[in-house]
């Protein structure tokens, strides 16, 4: 009776009897998105490299922030790139200024913005000199440089309970880190240099002497001065190009109509 029922049952039901012989299902792991993010750092968003790649790609954190022209000149002169943090002496201060260290820290983040505490962590993690120094001294200098230089700006969070620091210029194009002094430099903008403005049409000037005294001595001198000014202005108006909608209509002046009153 039982065998007849089994023979009449669908095939997928018969396959359920053999489930005990199958290998057990591996345990389901919790999704990283559902787990609580403890100790989150913005550097956790970067993909981890394997050991072979990371060992072969050990470079200085500042090596990618120099200008292309400086890197080419560096190869031609035979100078080496800046040493990595692993080979630095913990007692020797790095040549990079505070604004250069801040720029490197901000540029290394995926969102190109960091909190002040994250900037501290980047500097102490990549440069062992600051790890052995008193935090109060160099961290105070970092905060001072953030508010001093125009290359950095504070970005408030949406809830208004904190802030991030970002750069106003792109590191590597607008600004760069100098290989010579390790300071943050701004690229020189190519501004067209125009020649000094020249006055092509001189303005007629009256003599510096007292006009009243001249006219009292010679009443005809006023008419002569006005006539000379009129002729010079007419010559200048002929050289000015006509602008559509703004015609230049010179007003003729009759020098003979001016008379200086005679003194009694």
From Swiss-Prot:
UniProt keywords, alphabetically = Cytoplasm, DNA-binding, Nucleus, Transcription, Transcription regulation
| Entries under CDD domains matching the protein | FH_FOX
* Polar residues: compositionally biased ranges: 70-89
Instruction: State the PROSITE patterns in the record.
Output: FORK_HEAD_2, FORK_HEAD_3
Q: What ranges does the record list as Low complexity composition bias?
A: 50-64
Please tell me whether the keyword Membrane is annotated for this protein: no
Q: DNA-binding region at which residues? A: 93-186
The places in or outside the cell where this protein is found are: Nucleus; Cytoplasm
UniProt keyword S-adenosyl-L-methionine present: no
Principal place where this protein is found?
A: nucleus
Summary of the knockout phenotype? RNAi-mediated knockdown by injection into adults has little or no phenotypic effect. However, simultaneous knockdown of forkhead gene fkh-2 causes 12% of eggs produced by hermaphrodites to arrest development at late stages of embryogenesis and 81% arrest after hatching as L1 stage larvae.
Q: Which Gene3D superfamilies match?
A: Winged helix-like DNA-binding domain superfamily/Winged helix DNA-binding domain (1.10.10.10)
Region Disordered: start-end pairs? 15-36, 50-93
Query: GO terms for biological process?
Result: anatomical structure morphogenesis; cell differentiation; embryo development ending in birth or egg hatching; nematode larval development; regulation of transcription by RNA polymerase II
- A molecular function (GO) term: RNA polymerase II cis-regulatory region sequence-specific DNA binding
Report the GO terms under cellular component. Answer: cytoplasm; nucleus
Write out the function statement from the record: Transcription factor. Plays a role in embryogenesis and later development, perhaps acting redundantly with forkhead protein fkh-2.
- Tell me what this protein is called: Forkhead box protein pes-1
Q: Source species, please?
A: Caenorhabditis elegans
Q: What is the lineage of its organism?
A: Eukaryota, Metazoa, Ecdysozoa, Nematoda, Chromadorea
């Amino acid at each position: 009776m039982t065998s007849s029922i089994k023979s009449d049952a669908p095939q997928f039901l018969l396959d359920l009897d053999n489930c005990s012989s199958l290998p057990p299902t591996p345990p389901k792991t919790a999704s990283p998105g559902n787990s609580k993010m403890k100790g989150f750092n913005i550097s956790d968003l970067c993909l981890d490299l394997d050991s072979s790649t990371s060992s072969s790609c050990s470079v200085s954190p500042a090596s990618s922030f120099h200008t292309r022209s400086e890197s080419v000149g560096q190869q031609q002169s035979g100078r080496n790139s800046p040493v990595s943090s692993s080979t630095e002496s913990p007692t020797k201060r790095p040549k990079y200024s505070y604004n250069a260290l801040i720029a490197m820290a901000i540029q290394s983040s995926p969102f190109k913005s960091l909190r002040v505490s994250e900037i501290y962590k980047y500097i102490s993690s990549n440069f062992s000199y600051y790890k052995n120094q008193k935090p109060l001294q160099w961290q105070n200098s970092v905060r001072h440089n953030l508010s001093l230089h125009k290359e950095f700006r504070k970005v408030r969070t949406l809830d208004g309970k904190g802030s991030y620091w970002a750069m106003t210029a792109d590191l590597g194009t607008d600004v760069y880190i100098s290989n010579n002094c390790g300071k943050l430099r701004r690229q020189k903008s190519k501004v067209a240099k125009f020649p000094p403005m020249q006055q092509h049409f001189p303005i007629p000037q009256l003599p510096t002497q007292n006009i009243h005294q001249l006219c009292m001595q010679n009443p005809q001198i006023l008419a002569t001065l006005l006539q000379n000014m009129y002729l010079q202005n007419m010559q200048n108006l002929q050289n000015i190009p006509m602008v559509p909608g703004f015609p230049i209509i010179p007003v003729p002046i009759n020098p003979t109509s001016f008379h200086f009153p005679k003194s009694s």
